Amino acid sequence: PGEPLGAFIAAYIAIEIGALVSGKTKVDIIVTPVCCILSGAAAGYFAGPYISAAMKFIGQLVNINVDKSPIIGGIVVSVLMGIILTLPISSAAIGISMGLTGLAAGAATIGCCCNMIGFAVISYRENKFGGLIAQGLGTSMLQVPNIVRNPLIWLPAIISSAILGPVSSALLKMVSNPVGSGMGTSGLVGQFM
């Protein structure tokens, strides 16, 4: 318990159970919330530890692989976390769930930074200074509609992640912690964690 992916799955199960029960009785106002709360709590209680253990195991594998092979590991982690950051899911939650630390967390931070700064710079002509700040210090998630229309605009950020990820892990030995691994330049948290 206490892990973002486990909480998401528990909430999803609660929503589905609530949808199944809703509209079936005359006392829906009582039955539906009770079923949602109980099913979500049970799912979180019983599935949460296994989900948490699986995520920690995956995180340990990632941490070990980047430590053993900082060039290849740096490329993979940097590119994947940069992509995750830009998608409408929480890269910080994934970094925390996996427990990314050390060189792997540093490479993940660089991947997130490449996407945020990359999109901020390439969209400057249209978005001016406000867009530069919103995407550079906020989130590159603002570009999801543009990526859906033209996925090629993602290539410069992905390529820069692939180049700078191993630079951070193999040459500069940049390290971070689980929270900083998924933050990128958002509020400049990733660099200082």
Segments and roles (model prediction):
Residues P1-M193:
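Pore-lining transmembrane helices
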